């Protein structure tokens, strides 16, 4: 698969207008600032008789390095001591604690959660992670430990992703507005249990206020200071993060890591971009790579197939 740099170079060499190039560059994940720098470099190169080349371009590793993230995995059927032992064998520090919202940078913690149904329920909470500094490696070890000790999920469990870093007020407001316009297409690759859920409510009822919101305070007011939405504004005051609560419970590393990258890239793209209409297709999500689009389309097709089988069974 071509890197963003390679794709950007090819687009800049095309014999098309700046508007066409700008649209294509946005679709591969560049920000408005990145594109402005590219066009500036092109003009300067033209004056000096040299071939144009990109000045600013972010690889996925560079994007991940700019943000922190955290993962909360709700599950049940977990023997805590066994899970801690499995994690320790993989070099992962893990501790069992009572219910709390304390952040840390070093260890995974197991806490109680009264919303989870099933025997031996827990919420497995990661430390503050960075995707370019081994964060996904420790997450993979955590998922392997959970699956090895028989952790299970059901309709009452969810997966929460926190994204933090130097997020500007404009970027914050844009992220919520963009999520509103992406919500329906995201629903297509989420479990039906997460499309209408008390702990992850739809944003649609607050559309006017959300789209108008430009500041931390305005976003919180638009969301009625309620954290139980698919994207949670109240996490900012406590953790200085944006929390994504949309995803169903899972211990599968691929599902978690693809969704975590989606959330991080959405926040990054929102620094300079604000949608003004609903996105109808996964192919039209502007910050995803072809590989990521394929993954989420496969998830959407899987859920559509399950829905079709259920409909047939109900008819019979």
PLM regions with names:
Residues 40-149:
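Terminal catalytic/cofactor-binding subdomain
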Residues 121-123, 152-168, 239-245:
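Histidine-centered divalent-metal-coordination microenvironment in nucleic-acid enzymes
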Residues 68-70, 116, 121, 173-250:
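Aromatic/basic-lined ligand-recognition segments
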Residues 132-143, 167-191, 252-267, 306-315:
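Helical (often loop-to-helix) elements that flank the catalytic cores of nucleotide-handling enzymes
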Residues 152, 184-199, 268-294:
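Flexible helix-coil linker/hinge segments at domain or subdomain boundaries
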